[in-house]
């Protein structure tokens, strides 16, 4: 519109995969490298006011040696404009709009306790005119109900052609603390820039007053209280949508994460939508945000890795839910270059944000490897029973780490196994060859049942993150007879089916009542004598087989794990029912199995695949 002439005009892209060129009326307005961070292009000099304007965005998601991730082996890097685009209009003097596409407002906290907290609000103010401009900046803190808590105003003359920083310092007495899922209380900070009494710019940011502390060997503390770090990981893509999600899909994913009882989320392996970080602020999820420095190095990604970390920090700085910045994930070779780049990114994190932790992740299984010596926290990905050794080997590994590295802040940052819900068997070993085309859901369940029980016994593991909350795309692979899919999720790629492992964690983690019979998809039984497993966090269940109550229940790995052994099935149809009266309400679950003689479903699957090439 013509009334915008004389103002500054920006296009703010929340995500374009992964190299973007923005053209306005044939002129190149800006470029950006990286699929996951936002970027802002000023187009003030290219637009025609009061006329039609042509905007062209060229997007290329080909792998490049100078853009992380430098290959697309671990996950799909989707192309195009897949997140919202905003037209931002400001006065010639404004809170900065193009400081790495950040809000331009940075909130820090010091000396946080129940009695008081010190809060500093720094605002970057930009002047593009050729003359000094007298301005007033007001920073105000409001409580959840909109009541003013504190306010500070300052008058100044903004120098021409440049950016200046202005800060307000507050001391809050008896602050209402942000206490995770228990009480995710948020204030809001409103920064107003005024000229001659008129508001010319305003930015609103969340304020959750909290203190994170990690103590080696003891755990994670939130505001001085030990806090359980019950973690899941999340890739953002959906079947049929890729990464082009609306807030509806983000909200659905978060609802499942809340339902399972998680308290912390590792958003892997890249910066995710700012909307989802904001929702974690309001839900009380403690989160880990990271950049896509993964898998391999090219030697040409140094600048871009720093750029993407700087963008992540500045764009996400004010989210109280974020406790750590992730530097890299399983970047193995060459060691010297990787260690140097990790150290440099860590230093950048501390320069940009000295109050949060950093973490680097490897899959080596020992804590003295040089690529992981340059961050505050050691993250380790271990897939016992899947990529290495046996399911049960997690226990001696943790005990060895406790003994040899008691001073380390150590997290188990990935663990689990794939599960194709179409693949089922009762016949399981303690390890599975991940190159096999047969990925039984029951093996994933067995893995998580045992491994979570061991993790829960060891507070040395500061946090654990199961891999993954949802199945996701891996374009270059074929796993478990499915193209381009990693199936380690607790839910399927389309989010329609919750696997048995989902209910294992919900029973162990959630305060919501759970009564669940496992192996409902393993309906064609291979053995006449079998076991029945029930997850119940509301007491000992009563289980019936074809109307007859079973006896001889025993506890499994945790207090929610109930097993009935040596159950003899009838030939043909078998109806299993679990029931339990809890606080005056009856809970039930029912499934159906069929037994038609001894068989081996894995052997049948492999034979059929050999003969027909598919199942």
Model region roles, listed by residue range:
Residues 1-268, 277-279, 283-287, 308, ...:
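Secreted/periplasmic carbohydrate-active enzymes, especially glycoside hydrolases
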Residues 254-257, 264-497, 501-508, 512-531, ...:
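Substrate-binding/catalytic cleft of secreted carbohydrate-active enzymes
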């Amino acid at each position: 519109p013509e009334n915008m002439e004389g103002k500054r005009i920006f296009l703010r892209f929340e995500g374009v995969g992964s190299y973007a060129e923005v053209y306005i009326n044939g002129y190149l307005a800006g470029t950006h490298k990286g699929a996951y961070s936002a970027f802002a292009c000023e187009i003030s000099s290219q637009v025609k006011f009061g006329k039609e304007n042509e905007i062209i965005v060229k997007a290329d998601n080909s792998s490049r040696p100078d853009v992380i991730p430098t290959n697309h082996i671990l996950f799909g890097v989707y192309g195009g404009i897949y997140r919202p685009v905003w037209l931002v209009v400001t006065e010639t003097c404004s809170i900065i709009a193009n400081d790495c596409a950040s809000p331009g407002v940075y909130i820090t906290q010091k000396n946080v306790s129940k009695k008081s907290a010190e809060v500093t609000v720094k605002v970057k103010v930009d002047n593009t005119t050729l003359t000094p401009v007298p301005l007033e900046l007001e920073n105000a803190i409001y409580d959840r109900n909109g009541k003013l808590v504190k306010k500070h105003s300052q008058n100044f003359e903004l120098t021409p052609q440049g950016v200046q920083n202005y800060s307000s310092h507050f001391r809050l007495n008896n602050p209402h603390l942000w206490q995770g899922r228990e009480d995710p209380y948020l204030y809001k900070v409103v920064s107003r820039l005024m000229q001659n009494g008129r508001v010319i710019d305003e930015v609103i940011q969340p304020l959750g007053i909290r203190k994170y502390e990690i103590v080696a060997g003891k755990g994670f503390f939130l505001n001085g209280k030990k806090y359980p770090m019950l973690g899941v990981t999340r890739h953002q893509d959906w079947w049929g949508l890729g990464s082009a999600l609306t807030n509806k899909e983000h909200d659905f994913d978060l609802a499942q994460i809340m339902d399972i009882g998680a308290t912390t989320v590792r958003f892997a392996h890249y910066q995710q939508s700012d909307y989802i970080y904001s929702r974690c602020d309001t839900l009380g999820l403690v989160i880990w945000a990271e950049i896509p420095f993964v898998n391999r190095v090219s030697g040409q990604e140094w600048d871009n890795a720093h750029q993407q970390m700087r963008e992540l920090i500045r764009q996400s700085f004010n989210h109280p839910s974020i406790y750590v910045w992730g530097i890299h994930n399983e970047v193995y070779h060459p060691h010297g270059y990787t260690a140097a780049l990790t150290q440099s990114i860590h230093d950048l994190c501390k320069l940009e944000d000295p109050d949060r932790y950093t973490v680097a992740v490897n899959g080596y299984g020992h804590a003295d490897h040089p690529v992981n010596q340059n961050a505050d926290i050691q993250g380790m990905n271990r897939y016992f029973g899947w990529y290495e050794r046996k399911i049960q080997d997690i226990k001696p590994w943790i005990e060895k780490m406790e003994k040899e590295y008691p001073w380390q802040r150590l997290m188990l940052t990935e663990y689990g196994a794939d599960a194709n819900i179409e693949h089922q068997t009762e016949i399981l070993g303690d390890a599975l060859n991940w190159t096999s085309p047969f990925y039984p859901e029951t093996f994933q369940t067995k893995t998580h049942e045992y491994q979570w029980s061991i993790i829960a016994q060891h507070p040395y593991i500061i946090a654990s993150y199961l891999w993954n909350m949802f199945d996701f795309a891996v374009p270059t692979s074929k796993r478990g007879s499915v193209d381009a899919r990693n199936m380690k999720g607790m839910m399927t790629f389309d989010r329609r089916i919750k696997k048995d492992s989902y209910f294992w964690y919900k029973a162990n983690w959630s305060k919501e009542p759970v009564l669940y019979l496992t192996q409902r998809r393993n309906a064609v039984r291979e053995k006449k004598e079998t076991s029945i497993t029930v997850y119940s966090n509301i007491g000992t269940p009563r289980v019936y087989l074809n109307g007859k109550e079973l006896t001889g229940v025993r506890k499994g790995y945790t207090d929610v794990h109930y097993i009935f052994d040596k159950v003899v099935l009838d030939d043909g149809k078998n109806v299993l029912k679990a029931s339990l009266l809890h606080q005056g309400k009856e809970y039930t679950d029912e499934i159906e199995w069929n037994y038609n003689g001894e068989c081996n479903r894995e052997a049948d699957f492999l034979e059929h695949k050999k003969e027909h090439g598919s199942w």
